Amino acid sequence: MSSKKAKTKTTKKRPQRATSNVFAMFDQSQIQEFKEAFNMIDQNRDGFIDKEDLHDMLASLGKNPTDAYLDAMMNEAPGRINFTMFLTMFGEKLNGTDPEDVIRNAFACFDEEATGTIQEDYLRELLTTMGDRFTDEEVDELYREAPIDKKGNFNYIEFTRILKHGAKDKDD
């Protein structure tokens, strides 16, 4: 063994992957159970869940899913479903939150200039007058830790990242 292979804490070459947080959401026994479930669904054992795997698994349960139903299930993933993606999707379902892009796109509907921000007064008006209306106190609570710049722009891209992955450590 060469000394170059010794662990050092000075290198910061590997960026953190967005999906790495999903493994922290579950303990080792839960991850093992998810792995067993994944392997049961992955009928052809290629390391990915595809439409045929879903069909075969549902058929084994006495179901006869339509192509449209299977397509809708497959379209919930942004790409091929490997174990990490499977775990991420389950984590989002169990956490009760929408995927990051769905949340970001909901905010983007009100960002006419595609700046990644919404004026905080305008967002307050939207939140208190449309859909499931927030109270002013709830909006105040939301804004307390929200990324709002000095010009009053609510950065919904950063807010969505914080919502899904937690706040960055700051030296406040």
UniProtKB/Swiss-Prot annotation:
Residues 1-16 have a biased composition (Basic residues). Residues 1-20 are annotated as: Disordered. One of its GO terms (molecular function) is myosin heavy chain binding. The modification Phosphoserine is found at S20. The keyword Metal-binding applies. Ca(2+) binds at D42, N44, D46, D53. GO terms for cellular component: apical part of cell; brush border; cell cortex; cytoplasm; myofibril; myosin II complex; protein-containing complex; stress fiber. Pfam families: EF-hand_11 (PF08976), EF-hand_7 (PF13499). One of its GO terms (biological process) is regulation of cell shape. It comes from the Eukaryota. Phosphorylation increases the actin-activated myosin ATPase activity and thereby regulates the contractile activity. It is required to generate the driving force in the migration of the cells but not necessary for localization of myosin-2 at the leading edge. Phosphorylation is reduced following epigallocatechin-3-O-gallate treatment. Residues 29-64, 98-133, 134-169 form the EF-hand domain. SMART domains: EFh. Keywords: Calcium, Metal-binding, Motor protein, Muscle protein, Myosin, Phosphoprotein, Repeat. The modification Phosphothreonine is found at T19. Myosin is a hexamer of 2 heavy chains and 4 light chains: interacts with myosin heavy chain MYO19. PANTHER family: MYOSIN REGULATORY LIGHT CHAIN 2. This chain binds calcium. Myosin regulatory subunit that plays an important role in regulation of both smooth muscle and nonmuscle cell contractile activity via its phosphorylation. Phosphorylation triggers actin polymerization in vascular smooth muscle. Implicated in cytokinesis, receptor capping, and cell locomotion. This is Myosin regulatory light chain 12B. It comes from Rattus norvegicus. The lineage of its organism: Eukaryota, Metazoa, Chordata, Craniata, Vertebrata. The gene is Myl12b.
